[in-house]
């Protein structure tokens, strides 16, 4: 879930004992899950919009394009790694794996040669590396992960999704309906009450139409 924050969930057959992650019994009998979260994702891009790109927001408010579209202009010209600018995305503390509300964000390596486009790309990259950090911990428990299904407002950003695919080395798939949490809740509720056509949990994916797919490029 690429929303204001990131929430990752992976189904498992048994409860996993790992204090770096959240773990619980899943709503479907016989299944469990492990999950993880990054506190600043969409909230970080919103901070950049309001603080670093106020002109893009003003342009939108005056009838121009969406501010986030304006912010993406020329971002693809910034090289992978943002010319050495590294962001630690702990702008609102951090959830897993460190579980520290007092953690703080960092811009490391900032020079006079960097632009706000460098800063913004570095922020997007930092969230991707946070996702990868969580993913690596999940993979320690011998649960195969071949593909990441991403939902939420952040999936509208093609470059961001490609960065996540490149950093994790995993294929990223998005659905046609990107408001994943509420749509998924509705499907689960329909299945729970055995609403006609939704009785089988295993067939709920039939109602999820595919959107875009991002294939990882080799980096580094």
Range-by-range predicted roles:
Residues 1-9:
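Phosphate-binding/catalytic loop of phosphoryl-transfer enzymes
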Residues 10-220:
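Glycine/Thr-rich phosphate-binding loops that ligate phosphate moieties of nucleotide
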């Amino acid at each position: 879930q690429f929303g204001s924050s990131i929430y990752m969930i992976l189904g498992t057959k048994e409860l996993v004992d790992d204090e770096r992650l959240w773990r619980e019994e899943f709503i479907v009998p016989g299944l469990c899950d492990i999950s993880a979260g990054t506190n600043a994702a969409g909230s970080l891009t919103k901070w950049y919009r309001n603080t670093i790109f106020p002109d893009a927001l003003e342009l939108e408010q005056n009838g121009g394009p969406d501010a986030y579209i304006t912010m993406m202009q020329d971002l693809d010209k910034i090289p992978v790694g943002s010319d050495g600018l590294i962001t630690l995305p702990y702008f609102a503390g951090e959830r897993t794996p460190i579980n520290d509300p007092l953690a703080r964000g960092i811009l490391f390596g900032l020079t006079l040669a960097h632009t706000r486009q460098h800063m913004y790309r570095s922020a997007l990259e930092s969230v991707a590396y946070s996702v990868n950090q969580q993913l690596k911990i999940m993979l320690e428990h011998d649960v195969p992960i071949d593909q990441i299904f991403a939902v939420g407002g952040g999936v509208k950003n093609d470059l961001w999704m490609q960065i996540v695919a490149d950093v994790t080395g995993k294929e990223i798939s998005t659905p046609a309906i990107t408001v994943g949490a509420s749509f998924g809740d509705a499907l689960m509720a329909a299945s729970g009450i055995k609403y006609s056509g939704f009785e089988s949990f295993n067939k709920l994916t039939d109602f999820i139409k595919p959107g875009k797919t991002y294939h990882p490029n080799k980096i580094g």
